[in-house]
Amino acid sequence: KRIALWVALLVFMGCMLPSVATAQTKQPTAQSLINTMAQRLEKGAKITFSGELFDASGARIETKKGVLYTLGKKFRVRYNPIDANYNGREFSFYNAEDRTYTIMYPSMEDLAILNPFVFLSSSASVYNIKELSGTKTSRIIAFTLRKKMENITSLEVSFLRKTNAPSQIVGIFADGMRLVINITSIEGETPSSQMFIQQQSSYPGSELVDLR
């Protein structure tokens, strides 16, 4: 279950990645900030991150570090023990802990959380967007699901006021667990097309879990 939580939220970060923003004298609205990120998504980006998972009581369960690549509708995210990929059609991931390779066709509902492009392009119909009280240095935008889904119930994303770049993503889950992702660095980068090709043969001895 923990792995599912990490995958669901970490890949959501792809929608924040393209915001390699420049300083502006006028703060954009929450919706225009999202629209700008959607437009920049297809250019490709690389993000490094660290994250902490907390249980419903607030106790920290685990920490992770990883990297996420995006290009258009595609993304690749790697963090121990997961290597996950979406090639625009199929979503797959390898779990090094149990040596399983899972592949599926995600539904539009799945993609609203998993796929950055779909999340942004459908955010108005899938989420209610509201700006919360921020700090002197950051703005906080809340995304609340219009329709109940199995895992994530809401997301809060912090943006630096000076650059409009995302700095933190907090995911709240139905069971009260909370995942906090801190963005370490953002780089504008065009990944190779090979980055978004993932096959079971790359993981010798793995067990196939085909959910297609």
Give residue spans per PLM region:
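Positively charged n-region of N-terminal signal peptides that target proteins for export
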Residues: K1-R2
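Bacterial N-terminal signal peptides
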Residues: V7-P18
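N-terminal leader/targeting segments and the immediate start of mature chains
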Residues: S19-I61, L71-K74, S201-R212
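Beta-turn initiation residues at beta-strand->coil junctions
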Residues: L53, R78-Y79, A96, V170-F173
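Solvent-exposed strand-loop boundary residues in beta-sheet-rich modules
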Residues: S57, E97-R99, D175
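An acidic-aromatic
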Residues: V67-L114, L179
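Flexible, surface-exposed loop/linker segments and immediately adjacent secondary-structure boundaries
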Residues: P106-T137
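Gly/Pro-enriched, hydrophobic low-complexity segments
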Residues: S125-Y127, G134-R212
